[in-house]
């Protein structure tokens, strides 16, 4: 193989389709916009959600629910993520933040039971699922709600 025999990967060099450049191009004259009408005009087209004057779907459906301004957002930590720590480590929210297990503290840390924990750890968090609590204690560790 020589340099002049190299070919780009199939589909990596797509040629831009220039419309409105002569009838022979297959996309001349109306440039793929059809004849007249709103969509053929410059700046033409209907707004998002417009259904030709029929009451649009988003207005036919009722409003539902509300946003709770007192909502608490917990940073989630699964048991599998706790295995990176050494036996006997005291796992605190600050340590989890430092080691990159969580990216933000939010309103606290909640430990969930996805995966298994094989180390004996002291875990301090704001909330625990009941199965996570049992799993940590079954591994010989302790659980402390902050």
Curated annotation (Swiss-Prot):
Keywords for this entry?
Ribonucleoprotein, Ribosomal protein, RNA-binding, rRNA-binding
rRNA-binding among keywords: yes
Q: What is a GO molecular function of this protein?
A: rRNA binding
**Coiled-coil stretches:** none
Database matches in InterPro entries: Ribosomal_uL15 (IPR030878), Ribosomal_uL15/eL18 (IPR021131), Ribosomal_uL15/eL18_sf (IPR036227), Ribosomal_uL15_bac-type (IPR005749), Ribosomal_uL15_CS (IPR001196)
- Locations of Gly residues compositional bias? 21-31
Q: Name one GO biological process term.
A: translation
List the biased-composition ranges (Basic and acidic residues). Answer: 1-13
Cellular compartments per GO CC: cytosolic large ribosomal subunit
Keyword RNA-binding tagged: yes
Which PROSITE patterns does UniProt cross-reference here? RIBOSOMAL_L15
The annotated region (Disordered) lies at 1-48
Which PANTHER family is this protein grouped with? 50S RIBOSOMAL PROTEIN L15, LARGE RIBOSOMAL SUBUNIT PROTEIN UL15M
User: What HAMAP family does its record include?
Assistant: Ribosomal_uL15
UniProt family annotation: Belongs to the universal ribosomal protein uL15 family.
**Summary of the function given for this chain in its UniProt record:** Binds to the 23S rRNA.
Self-association and partners? Part of the 50S ribosomal subunit.
Q: What is this protein called?
A: Large ribosomal subunit protein uL15
Q: Which organism is it from?
A: Bacillus cytotoxicus (strain DSM 22905 / CIP 110041 / 391-98 / NVH 391-98)
Could you tell me the gene encoding this protein?
rplO
